[in-house]
Amino acid sequence: MTRGLVFFVSAACGVLADQLSKFIIAANLTPGTAIPESGFFQIVHVHNTGAAFSIFRGHTEWLIAASCLGVILALTAFFLRKKLPFLDTRPGVAALGIILAGTIGNLIDRVRLGYVTDFIQVGNFPTFNMADSCLTLGIIWLVLLYLTSSHSGGDASENA
């Protein structure tokens, strides 16, 4: 599979998983409902007008603009990846793809609904969704790829 295909398939699968999971939650749980009602792990239907940890709550226009910038940055990084060897690998473009997926997933919600649907609650950590998970895991993955390639003096492994 080419790097371009890895990037776009990663992004498409991430957006699909995010939007499908949010559709299932919205169709089956009213906002504020939790399953189970208490416990360390819950599925909770929450409307979040902010960003991570509900920062910038109520500033949807700014968050839409920031998300559009995020999409542009992810696409730019993909198209300029040859300048950063750790990005020009299948793992590098897959990580960029899931970052793009997370950005687009929440952007779709903000434009369509004016809020993001969050539903995963673990302990006292703020409620989040699949798009948030894509963003977080993609960024961690890119950092690890960068650290691995920088410390080894070469490119990140093509098959990592």
From Swiss-Prot:
Pathway: Protein modification; lipoprotein biosynthesis (signal peptide cleavage). The active site is at D118, D132. It is a multi-pass membrane protein. It is an enzyme of class 3 (hydrolase). PROSITE patterns: SPASE_II. GO terms for molecular function: aspartic-type endopeptidase activity. GO terms for cellular component: plasma membrane. It catalyses: Release of signal peptides from bacterial membrane prolipoproteins. Hydrolyzes -Xaa-Yaa-Zaa-|-(S,diacylglyceryl)Cys-, in which Xaa is hydrophobic (preferably Leu), and Yaa (Ala or Ser) and Zaa (Gly or Ala) have small, neutral side chains. GO terms for biological process: proteolysis. It is found in: Cell membrane. It holds the Pfam family Peptidase_A8. Its EC number is 3.4.23.36. It comes from the Bacteria. The keyword Transmembrane helix applies. This protein specifically catalyzes the removal of signal peptides from prolipoproteins. HAMAP family: LspA. Belongs to the peptidase A8 family. This is Lipoprotein signal peptidase. It comes from Dehalococcoides mccartyi (strain ATCC BAA-2266 / KCTC 15142 / 195) (Dehalococcoides ethenogenes (strain 195)).
